[in-house]
UniProtKB/Swiss-Prot annotation:
The gene is eac. This is Eac protein.
Amino acid sequence: MSGQSKYYDYYMVEGEDVKELIQSYDTINDQRNSILTTAAEKVGAIAWTTARSWGGEGGLLQSFVWEKGYEFPCQITIKREDFLDGKRVVIARGKGNTKEGRAYNKELDAIMHNANAKLKSLPEWNYYITNHYGIMRTGIGGQSGRGFGFVMLSTYGGKHPQRDDCLIFAIPNNKEERHGVVVIPDAFKKITYGQFYDIANAKEDEEETAE
């Protein structure tokens, strides 16, 4: 993201109230993981992908991930192939031009629909913390690395890896109202991209050496 760094402003916020906010997500996270794990187990999947929305909530179950070689109950179409924890995995659907494939897809869709109905009230971590502070903003960055169009930006943040009472955020710095008007909370401290990068990439087991 360094090529897009100038299109963001960077902040940190710390304190006891931040610690409480971080801890308050534990229950939500546990519930999300339970729902997603249960859904995956029903179809023999070992993982899943969730939907992403530009400046939106996202976080809903989008597809299941199976270990390559999994014996599906029907002919399938592989939508994507990748690696996960050193294993080759696939995202697949039943072949839509077969009766068995269509029936299998209905089964997958029903399980995803049921899971998503529960997930709607359980936001992903990034949305949870950005929504808490009212700092979600979108923006248009520089040219895409692929050379086609421009990068779509939105606020993102996370926990300081070495602290339980500190969050860091990157907020698009465009001023166009159509991308969202936000008021930076008084408790937020502006930091440089270098400081943000160092914090975001710090290892959890290292002692913090810089303010």
